[in-house]
Amino acid sequence: MSPVLGCDSKSGSIPDSAARPLLGSPMTRCFWCNEDPLYIAYHDQEWGVPLRDAQKLFELLLLEGFQAGLSWITILKRRARYREVLHGFEVERLAQLSDAEIEALMLDPSIIRNRLKLKAVRTNARAWLALQDPVGLLWSFVGGEPKINHFKDRSEVPAITSEAEAMSKALKKAGFTFVGPTICYAYMQASGMVMDHTVDCDRYAILSR
């Protein structure tokens, strides 16, 4: 299966031949990267790059939750707006969101208006603050260092792994929501905990060093 974060797994327009040059670029990219410039920049600059900044990891975890049931490009196009309305993803502030603020967000057509997902922002912020070392915990599921995979094509890329299942179980126990194993594996891919650029992608050579 294709990676969940960074792809529209429902799209039938991406050929199995996988990586290919896009928009005149000499780069060869992963099979899931479509021709949207925002998507291309995300693939080339963010996806799979090891992330250890607590604030950015928290933001990414929330964005993963927003993506549930949707394509990643849907969230990516709204990321800047989410940063505006969610106080720059400042965890302490989001932990104090009031019910009235959540209801106000439900009126904003520029974001995904899902009450359960918006309530999860507050729930997950509080759970995050309760962790002594959230970054250490998240990276512990891959032994503290990126797990470099060597997948040749989309059929080899998993949607769930034992590490993702362990992360999901631990986060749920800690009080997080919207952290099922599929979401957790997508999170691991995006944050560089696992490196899942396929071997024919130019980013593979860079990130597998």
Spans of features found by a protein language model:
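Short hydrophobic transmembrane-like helices used for membrane targeting/insertion
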Residues: 1-4, 14-16
